[in-house]
């Protein structure tokens, strides 16, 4: 499916990009998530966002890590196929979670959200945040999967119900919003990138975009830099 791309899993590999492409290239986020859009804005690079319309159902036997990686690639690839120019750089991202080796799906409703959070009490949950960058200028696909471990507090059922009613995290992996009140459910977080749990690993992404010529600290690519 991805044979037309040269695939890299090394964040520091610099690709040879013609200088004029830096001006013509357009950055596209393959997501309709308002949270991912806000996080990407932190890098200061102009971008557009488009709906990849990807089915996020897990395949039989698929682990959380493989699910997140596949969906991140599928989202970026779907937008890449729709574009009518070879100057675009496309970002796809996805997140999946597991507890005791079992995949935690997006709860979808209040009952499932409460059941998931009750199961997480006092335990360590693994979150896998995948990010994929497809550079149509060079035909390259770069990808990373960040592993974040979250140790949950042990709270009363009434507290969990109150949280769910306040934030309604029905479409979130694990049944909480780490960018909001969900942080109050945690005892500790272990990760190499604190932004990964929020849905977009900005440390890896900034480094990768810099490696392909889209540097947040360069005036040519970031209008906010003087």
Map each language-model feature to its residues.
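Anionic-ligand binding patches
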Residues: 25-28, 64-226
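N-terminal beta1-alpha1 ligand-phosphate binding loop
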Residues: 25-45
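A short beta-strand-loop structural module common to alpha/beta enzyme folds
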Residues: 48-56
């Amino acid at each position: 499916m991805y044979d037309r791309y040269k695939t890299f899993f090394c964040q520091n590999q610099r690709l040879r990009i013609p200088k004029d492409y830096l001006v013509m290239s357009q950055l596209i986020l393959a997501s309709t998530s308002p949270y991912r859009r806000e996080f990407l804005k932190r890098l200061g690079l102009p971008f557009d966002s488009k709906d990849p319309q990807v089915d996020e159902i897990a395949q039989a036997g698929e682990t959380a890590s493989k699910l997140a990686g596949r969906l991140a690639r599928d989202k970026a690839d779907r937008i890449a196929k729709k574009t009518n120019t070879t100057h675009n750089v496309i970002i796809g991202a996805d997140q999946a979670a597991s507890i005791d080796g079992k995949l935690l799906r997006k709860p979808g409703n209040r009952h499932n959200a409460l059941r998931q959070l009750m199961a997480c009490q006092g335990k360590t949950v693994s979150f896998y945040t995948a990010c994929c960058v497809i550079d149509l200028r060079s035909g390259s696909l770069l990808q990373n999967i960040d592993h974040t471990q979250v140790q949950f507090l042990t709270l009363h059922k009434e507290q969990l119900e109150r949280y769910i009613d306040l934030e309604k995290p029905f479409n979130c992996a694990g049944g909480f919003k780490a960018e909001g009140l969900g942080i109050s459910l945690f005892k500790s977080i272990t990760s190499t990138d604190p932004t990964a749990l929020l849905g977009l690993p900005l440390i890896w992404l900034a480094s990768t975009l810099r490696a392909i010529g889209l540097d947040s600290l360069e005036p040519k690519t970031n209008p906010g830099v003087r």
